[in-house]
């Protein structure tokens, strides 16, 4: 195979960044360059593309962990490490989305708590606690509802209006 970026490491994703489709490049940037960036704003499309990736990533990780491991400890470790890998970028893009709506950052924490509780309960094999699920689910739904609202169409204290393509 010919190296598409001569002089660069062909196994390094950064060397392929310029050749990626725009939406994949934004997702890659959110995972690497904007990993812990809390400033600025994120548009609706960018936010939902990232969350769709997050759900697919966690589901795939759970399936792989379930089919390849025999012990619950390894399964829990793999799923927890996978969630920790994606938790910070998910939180930061949620914060930037809330900046676009002008809402408090508190609402970005709720989906993370709900996902953590769901993963912990599932991986530890605990029986479902429907009251906790209902409370966390309702709070996460309200949070995602806030993040689904259109942003403020003008520049604000967090930056200029995000560009949606």
Where are these regions (language model features)?
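Membrane-interface extramembranous regions at the lipid-water interface
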Residues: 2-53, 90-106, 144-165
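Hydrophobic alpha-helical transmembrane segments in multi-pass membrane proteins
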Residues: 45-92, 104-149
């Amino acid at each position: 195979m010919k190296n598409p970026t001569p002089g660069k490491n062909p196994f390094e994703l950064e060397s392929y960044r310029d050749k990626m489709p725009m939406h994949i490049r934004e997702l890659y940037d959110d995972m690497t360059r904007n990993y812990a960036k809390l400033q600025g704003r994120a548009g609706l499309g960018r936010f939902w593309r990232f969350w769709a990736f997050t759900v697919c990533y966690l589901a795939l990780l759970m399936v792989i962990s379930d089919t390849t491991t025999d012990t619950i400890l390894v399964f829990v470790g793999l799923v927890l490490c996978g969630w920790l890998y994606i938790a910070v970028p998910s939180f930061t893009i949620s914060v930037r989305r809330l900046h676009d709506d002008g809402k408090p950052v508190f609402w970005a924490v709720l989906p993370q708590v709900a996902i953590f509780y769901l993963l912990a309960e599932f991986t530890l094999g605990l029986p479902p606690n429907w009251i906790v699920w209902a409370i966390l689910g309702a709070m996460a739904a309200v949070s995602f509802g806030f993040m689904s609202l259109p942003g403020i169409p003008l520049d604000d204290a967090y930056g200029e209006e995000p560009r949606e393509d």
